[in-house]
Amino acid sequence: MQDAIQAKSALISVFNKEGLAPIVTKMHELGITLYSTGGTAAFIEAQGVPVLQVENLTSYPSILGGRVKSLHPKVFGGILNRRSNDNDQEELAQYSIPHLDIVLVDLYPFEDTVKSGASETDIIEKIDIGGISLIRAAAKNYKDVLCVSSVSDYDAFLALLERKNGKTELSDRKQFAANAFRVSSHYDTHIFNFFDEGNGALKLSYNTGKELRYGENPHQKGAFFGDFDEVFFKHHGKALSYNNLLDVDAAVQLMAEFKDDAPTFAILKHNNACGLATRDNISQAYTDALAADPVSAFGGVLIANTTIDRSTAEKINTLFCEVVIAPAFEKNALEILKQKKNRILLDLKSYPKPSTLVRSCLNGYLVQERDGITDEKSMLNEVTERKATAQEIDDLLFASKIAKHTKSNTI
């Protein structure tokens, strides 16, 4: 094992080719021999960069409609051989196996295919076999091989090539190996969860968390694991804190109960609604929601189920609040609300529907199904002598939606 290694060869097999062109161009400039397969090889050739087909190395064609391309001893021998092991090097010479110093892979998009609602047949075909094997082999042998395991590493890898002219240090290879095992474990977790279908096992996997300003208190570190941008578009304001996110989650889950109703506005503090109203227009809904508890509303999180207009924005602007959430904001409403530089303004793109709630407990975790039931008139059983009026029933159902999301004694 050498600390510094000058790369002379690379194997490239990727699904996402965005950002690949400057990488292969740079490797060619540095004299690195490129091996590749199928569509990736065709893409590299289209950049005017010479590439050797893996089939030429293995003397074996791609078979089973492309299911088996790179799974061959001449490929994995070139990756897994220990450069400092004489027996390994003798075997490579015996079987004419070249060293592979860099392995660059981007896996089939299994997670995205599941999310798209594709058929089971299509999902199964997106379980990457060769790519994941290449990643594990290259990362295992990080002392001699650099593994680039996803498109998210392309920029860092290109910068490394440019900075060190194709040379890699042990610290570089170990860092990329850590990323590779993160990618492989994340990938396998989503495959397991697809097959398990929630039958008792708990396996969670998220990519690198987003560091927050702090946790619940300033002396605590905090991070968010998930795709915030999938749910929100942030227009304005300071970075969200741990407590902000808890309130935002509570606000979104509460408003999901009213997302298809008439204009509704809610104000939350410490994860609980301190005011909520449904009216003919959003401006009046805000006024009445605030009137429920104007004291607790100070520093709260505000959410609407429809576009916030100028009239509503002018009212909100007189209140100190941390976050304002809505499906959309009128342009002049945004201009008004942006007058407070720290106020966080979020477009709600969609209502997330997490199926489970998870929290740490003792030396393990508590897991439960999220409460997805909303009370309806047909579910009610009247047991009193006096029957409720239609208005009373509507009021009770309205209150029930709010009580469902209240974490303290409901009034």
Q: Where are the language model's segments positioned?
A:
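Alpha-helix capping and helix-loop boundary segments enriched in small/acidic/polar residues
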Residues: 11-14, 122, 126-129, 242
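Non-catalytic interface/targeting segments
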Residues: 1-30, 39-70, 102, 178, ...
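Short beta-strand segments
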Residues: 13, 80, 103-108, 148-149, ...
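Feature captures the catalytic cores and cofactor-binding loops of soluble hydro-lyases/lyases
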Residues: 18-23, 27-74, 78-82, 87-98, ...
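Active-site-adjacent beta-strand anchor residues
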Residues: 13, 34-37, 128, 147-150, ...
